[in-house]
Amino acid sequence: MLISQRPTLSEEVLTDNRSQFVIEPLEPGFGYTLGNSLRRTLLSSIPGAAVTSIRIDGVLHEFTTVPGVKEDVTAIILNLKSLVVSSEEDEPVTMYLRKQGPGEVTAGDIVPPAGVTVHNPELHIATLNDKGKLEVELVVERGRGYVPAVQNRASGAEIGRIPVDSIYSPVLKVTYKVDATRVEQRTDFDKLILDVETKSSITPRDALASAGKTLVELFGLARELNVEAEGIEIGPSPAEADHIASFALPIDDLDLTVRSYNCLKREGVHTVGELVSRTESDLLDIRNFGQKSIDEVKVKLHQLGLSLKDSPPSFDPSQVAGYDVATGTWSTEAAYDDQDYAETEQL
């Protein structure tokens, strides 16, 4: 099995809806393979929500006007195509817009049901005069990609129901480039730089995660043909590699006090890997191994980026009684306690 170094992914947030992602190092040629796959998936396959049809009170078709409204129906529909919405519902939902003139009609005047959010309330929809009145019923559905109005035309729809083009994709723009990067003595590795811009209904980070999930599901179909087929195996991350190396360390390297060291040795715990497989209750069952010894072990493991099996991830060494984080030393009381234990052991 060929093992490749695990790439890292970093994000630089450029604006609220635009981020640049860097994936490196990639095996030669994989920058374009991964970049093109992610770009096409981001632009075409990210789920979203959009208006699929509208009904305007007193209007039978789009080629007409509404009394008291500056814009004709076609212009109103064009404005509604720019509406950015998100929906948690899998079924079609209905929103309502009711406004009496005079004044401007914006997306903020739309009343969405629970589970639906309008993300650009400042969007201009129409302008009303003193006698103007606008009542619109909007149907929102979830989907992906682009669906033309002709496909949104439902058979048997009531008179006055106007289908509109639906742009479901929440991703506006994706570009990528591949640069060369160095790994030790080799300079032919790829660095993929992906620039993603989205609508306000989704963050670039979530959009990229969605694209990655889709590709994993699809590529899994090929893997299922033979799960034992040989391929390039991705190696552990640097942090994982450090942990693996730390597991092999003898507990002598932890520089524990005499009490803690002897208790662990007597219990048959000889390496860090054997130590992190124990819980606090396991260690407390060891003779002469008390809470002070537990705290000491947790501090030493924390310095290696490790923890006991059941230790919470929020462990803070500065909260341990008798331990000075700044100097990395224990209080005199703890030292005397250990000295007393050593003398007792000798007796």
Curated annotation (Swiss-Prot):
<dbReference type="GO" id="GO:0046983">
    <property type="term" value="F:protein dimerization activity"/>
</dbReference>
<dbReference type="InterPro" id="IPR036643">
    <property type="entry name" value="RNApol_insert_sf"/>
</dbReference>
<dbReference type="InterPro" id="IPR011262">
    <property type="entry name" value="DNA-dir_RNA_pol_insert"/>
</dbReference>
<comment type="subunit">
    <text>Homodimer. The RNAP catalytic core consists of 2 alpha, 1 beta, 1 beta' and 1 omega subunit. When a sigma factor is associated with the core the holoenzyme is formed, which can initiate transcription.</text>
</comment>
<dbReference type="Pfam" id="PF01193">
    <property type="entry name" value="RNA_pol_L"/>
</dbReference>
<feature type="region of interest" description="Alpha N-terminal domain (alpha-NTD)">
    <location>
        <begin position="1"/>
        <end position="226"/>
    </location>
</feature>
<keyword id="KW-0240">DNA-directed RNA polymerase</keyword>
<protein>
    <recommendedName>
        <fullName>DNA-directed RNA polymerase subunit alpha</fullName>
        <ecNumber>2.7.7.6</ecNumber>
    </recommendedName>
</protein>
<dbReference type="Pfam" id="PF01000">
    <property type="entry name" value="RNA_pol_A_bac"/>
</dbReference>
<keyword id="KW-0808">Transferase</keyword>
<dbReference type="GO" id="GO:0006351">
    <property type="term" value="P:DNA-templated transcription"/>
</dbReference>
<dbReference type="InterPro" id="IPR011263">
    <property type="entry name" value="DNA-dir_RNA_pol_RpoA/D/Rpb3"/>
</dbReference>
<dbReference type="InterPro" id="IPR011260">
    <property type="entry name" value="RNAP_asu_C"/>
</dbReference>
<dbReference type="InterPro" id="IPR011773">
    <property type="entry name" value="DNA-dir_RpoA"/>
</dbReference>
<keyword id="KW-0804">Transcription</keyword>
<feature type="region of interest" description="Alpha C-terminal domain (alpha-CTD)">
    <location>
        <begin position="243"/>
        <end position="347"/>
    </location>
</feature>
<dbReference type="GO" id="GO:0003899">
    <property type="term" value="F:DNA-directed RNA polymerase activity"/>
</dbReference>
<dbReference type="GO" id="GO:0000428">
    <property type="term" value="C:DNA-directed RNA polymerase complex"/>
</dbReference>
<dbReference type="GO" id="GO:0005737">
    <property type="term" value="C:cytoplasm"/>
</dbReference>
<dbReference type="GO" id="GO:0003677">
    <property type="term" value="F:DNA binding"/>
</dbReference>
<keyword id="KW-0548">Nucleotidyltransferase</keyword>
<dbReference type="Pfam" id="PF03118">
    <property type="entry name" value="RNA_pol_A_CTD"/>
</dbReference>
<dbReference type="InterPro" id="IPR036603">
    <property type="entry name" value="RBP11-like"/>
</dbReference>
<comment type="similarity">
    <text>Belongs to the RNA polymerase alpha chain family.</text>
</comment>
<comment type="function">
    <text>DNA-dependent RNA polymerase catalyzes the transcription of DNA into RNA using the four ribonucleoside triphosphates as substrates.</text>
</comment>
